[in-house]
Amino acid sequence: MAPYSLLVTRLQKALGVRQYHVASVLCQRAKVAMSHFEPSEYIRYDLLEKNINIVRKRLNRPLTLSEKIVYGHLDDPANQEIERGKTYLRLRPDRVAMQDATAQMAMLQFISSGLPKVAVPSTIHCDHLIEAQVGGEKDLRRAKDINQEVYNFLATAGAKYGVGFWRPGSGIIHQIILENYAYPGVLLIGTDSHTPNGGGLGGICIGVGGADAVDVMAGIPWELKCPKVIGVKLTGSLSGWTSPKDVILKVAGILTVKGGTGAIVEYHGPGVDSISCTGMATICNMGAEIGATTSVFPYNHRMKKYLSKTGRTDIANLAEEFKDHLVPDPGCQYDQVIEINLNELKPHINGPFTPDLAHPVADVGTVAEKEGWPLDIRVGLIGSCTNSSYEDMGRSAAVAKQALAHGLKCKSQFTITPGSEQIRATIERDGYAQILRDVGGIVLANACGPCIGQWDRKDIKKGEKNTIVTSYNRNFTGRNDANPETHAFVTSPEIVTALAIAGTLKFNPETDFLTGKDGKKFKLEAPDADELPRSDFDPGQDTYQHPPKDSSGQRVDVSPTSQRLQLLEPFDKWDGKDLEDLQILIKVKGKCTTDHISAAGPWLKFRGHLDNISNNLLIGAINIENGKANSVRNAVTQEFGPVPDTARYYKKHGIRWVVIGDENYGEGSSREHAALEPRHLGGRAIITKSFARIHETNLKKQGLLPLTFADPSDYNKIHPVDKLTIQGLKDFAPGKPLKCVIKHPNGTQETILLNHTFNETQIEWFRAGSALNRMKELQQ
């Protein structure tokens, strides 16, 4: 094995990198640590300023905030070609964050790279594997017992390779990042689609797949297609029942689930100052639901206040010094502008089954009656990475306190998920948690829980039609409880609390009355609560594991008989030929999210074992041939069976296959398993009308061909019984379409064109069999 420095030098030479950037290089003008946990890793505002000035001089125009932060992290700002929506940028992120469900595969890939240490500050957060059953402490103990093997792997891998480890119970990754790691101007990538949460603190924080994280941890420049910038101008101010959540619910209704694809959403305008820092994080977090690359707010006094309250006054002071680089230039141009008057914005509730179906709360009851949606609310759930801040808990408690004063409790079941151990300890100290319990709530563990399907729900049977209301971010079919008949709606935590007390979608807290225990009618007043605790946060229990300075003796063991973890085998290289006679595994009808492609919930336990988790491949996708989920025709036997079984049959018999998809294929989570699984089971290409950004990149990273119909109507020319040949791979080049020959069973053929977004580097991934294979080639 070559020394680490030599490996890095070889990689950089092969990739054309001029200088190896490490975040710990000392600042010229100031030395402020990126976090309390990494005292020798410094914020590089001086480098950000230098790069911004180089790019501004080249482009000769005012820059948006998004451009400042992104271009400020260019690997080669003097020579990088920059064109929004077209060129690929080579960037140097400041840090990497991984949650436990995706960190398993990311760390397995990093181990395969052969590198001894991560090159940038990185952390692992245990939040996804804790199932909600009865309550916080018992659920946490159960999760530690069930997931001991995985937690031990992540802890020892973190110690071995220099990655900080947040133990189970510490909280949700995005809340931990906001409290400890995000700062104005940071470029952070995370292996979770809601990483944009950090935009609430003025950073560009982007969700990626594990293979992208491996690149950054290996010290390789990270590639991102130069994003467009959508400006959202906020005027007026929030008041009454209207909350930050309503801003993004409104934006989702305007832009839809794919309207932000390929763009950063940048909020600006005088209305920004009426929103708390954690409220801005809520808005940025749910920007993932419109397909945005990320979202961001400009640095302001709210962020300064939050930094100071979370023990980072030194960062706030440094940000003040560089403030001009942390806000947009006057006169900067956006690719699209949306204007929202916060004075006129009403409380919203979105759903069911998609986060962009927006309704004012005042109207949803009427719409539900018309559509036949269940009006009675079975469960109200507050928390999640989107809405679990101190302010969120305080506003919900303010609503609950009014109900208690009139002798009322929740008519619906009611659960509360604190965002972090710090939030849990602080709301316990300040009495909010007890108020929420008194109104009928159950406080769950500091984890994702029901939001990602980690919910052992007992009150209904699968297939039973029912309604739940959450303060979460996603409400895809079956996501929360694996029941396709659960009508899930997303709204603010205070609206969830009010609706859980009333027990019906027909209740409008702005106008409707409740009847107290004494028989008297009363109206809930709009909640008011502190955005931050008046005294310091209570940190609660210490849940962080520092990586040791010397890890030379650290072992990382993966049992060959484990059902949870599996070392990776390299994927096969491209054989240099066109892809002939591909069988169609499934032609997908309609929406196909990463939840449909690789379900979460009970499958999370297999996230570190590629072969086992591949048994959930596309089990949620609807087959256009019969309108059913997880039922496809085996082209050899002509029998219908589960998608994974059919894929395994094809792999065993040497039959290569393809998936045909609809619009925005792969929207939702960043989980790269949705790309690893089809590759592992013999897939070669995914052909759709359009892709979600993260999933398209993940497919490329694993050596698959994500292709789009040059004419979207060609989707209708392909039938599940056809065979496809993809031609032109010997001359595969950026911007050059590939040909697809459709071979029908009756002997006729049609030829169509397929577009792609591959650049030269990504084409090398395909030829090598995967991005990881290519990395290994460059080490030799």
Curated annotation (Swiss-Prot):
Enzyme class at the top of the EC tree: lyase
Annotated region (Disordered), positions in chain: 524-560
Transit peptide boundaries: 1-27
The protein's required cofactors: [4Fe-4S] cluster
Coiled coil residues, start to end: none
Residues carrying Phosphoserine: 559, 670
InterPro entries registered for this protein in UniProt: Acnase/IPM_dHydase_lsu_aba_1/3, Acoase/IPM_deHydtase_lsu_aba, Aconitase/3IPM_dehydase_swvl, Aconitase/IPM_isomerase, Aconitase_4Fe-4S_BS, Aconitase_4Fe-4S_dom, Aconitase_dom2, Aconitase_mito-like
PTM remark: Forms covalent cross-links mediated by transglutaminase TGM2, between a glutamine and the epsilon-amino group of a lysine residue, forming homopolymers and heteropolymers.
Family stated for the protein in its record: Belongs to the aconitase/IPM isomerase family.
Protein name: Aconitate hydratase, mitochondrial
Organism: Mus musculus (Mouse)
Gene that encodes it: Aco2
